């Protein structure tokens, strides 16, 4: 929670081999190099997919990255049992993903209580106003708004703007999906996002830029560095 609750914009940078919207993203998947480069770039949190069917993730990949970096880590999976929360803690996760579309308010509150007992933070993902209300009622402290339409995979940042006022000021507001440029980050910052979740790399690139961590002292420089990542990956498509 503290990793993304700080002045300015926080960055949650993702390590994943595939996604439902893009298929296989990285045939050559140097996940340890990617994670280390995110850490060197000053990422506030590293997100790692462990879901095997749609994202081609694994618990072993998460564990290897956990052993290689000290940056806080988010385990992203379809969490549907409290067993997975205990498992995540044993794997070294600092945060887990809870998806409102999969959990009613009662179940979400129960899972959040288990997270509190285990010392885990939880990113509660929402897509619409009803899901945000459920997240708030359950006591979520980190609320993500996914700007991707899960029916056609299009991205609409106006969704983040429409829903912003429903998120309590004391909660961390994370904008998810489709962030492709510093202009996107600036737009999300202007509507009050506290953090962005960026699902790079989005090509089969085997190398990642490693900017100097000292460059990340302020938000403008931080966004410029992230734009370097985007430019390089776009050139390789």
Give the ranges of each region predicted by the language model.
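Glycine-rich active-site/cofactor-binding loop and its immediate structural neighborhood
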Residues: 19-76
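Glycine-rich phosphate-binding active-site loops on the catalytic face of alpha/beta enzymes
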Residues: 87-107, 144-153, 191-232
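Conserved, mostly hydrophobic/aromatic
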Residues: 13, 38, 46, 88, ...
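Glycine-enriched alpha-helix->loop->beta-strand junction motifs that scaffold or abut catalytic
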Residues: 42-43, 68-71, 90-96, 116-120, ...
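Alpha-helix-loop-beta-strand connector modules within alpha/beta enzyme cores
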Residues: 1-9, 55-78, 100-101, 107-125, ...
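Active-site mouth loops of central-metabolism enzymes
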Residues: 12-30, 71-80, 121-126, 174-179
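Active-site beta-loop-alpha junctions enriched in small/polar residues
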Residues: 16-18, 51, 78, 101, ...
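Catalytic cores of alpha/beta
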Residues: 80-92, 127-138, 175, 179-198
């Amino acid at each position: 929670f503290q990793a993304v609750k700080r002045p300015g914009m926080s960055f949650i940078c993702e390590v994943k081999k595939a996604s439902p919207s893009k298929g296989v993203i990285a045939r050559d998947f140097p996940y340890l190099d990617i994670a280390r480069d995110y850490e060197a770039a000053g990422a506030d949190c590293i997100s790692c997919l462990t879901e095997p069917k749609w994202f081609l993730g694994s618990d072993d990949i998460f564990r290897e990255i956990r052993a290689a970096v000290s940056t806080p880590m988010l385990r992203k999976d379809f969490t549907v049992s409290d067993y997975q929360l205990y498992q995540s803690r044993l794997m070294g996760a600092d945060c887990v993903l809870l998806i409102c579309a999969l959990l009613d308010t009662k179940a979400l509150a129960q899972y959040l209580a288990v997270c509190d007992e285990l010392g885990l933070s939880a990113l509660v993902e929402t897509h619409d106003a009803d899901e945000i209300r459920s997240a708030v009622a359950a006591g979520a402290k980190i609320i993500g708004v996914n700007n991707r339409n899960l029916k056609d995979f299009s991205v609409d940042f106006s969704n983040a703007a429409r829903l912003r006022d429903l998120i309590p000021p004391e909660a961390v507001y994370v904008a998810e999906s489709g962030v492709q440029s510093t202009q996107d980050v600036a737009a999300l910052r202007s509507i009050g996002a506290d953090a962005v979740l960026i699902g790079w790399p989005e090509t089969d690139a085997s190398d990642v830029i490693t900017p100097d961590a000292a460059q990340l002292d302020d938000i403008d420089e931080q966004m410029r560095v992230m734009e370097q990542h985007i430019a390089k990956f776009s050139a390789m498509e």
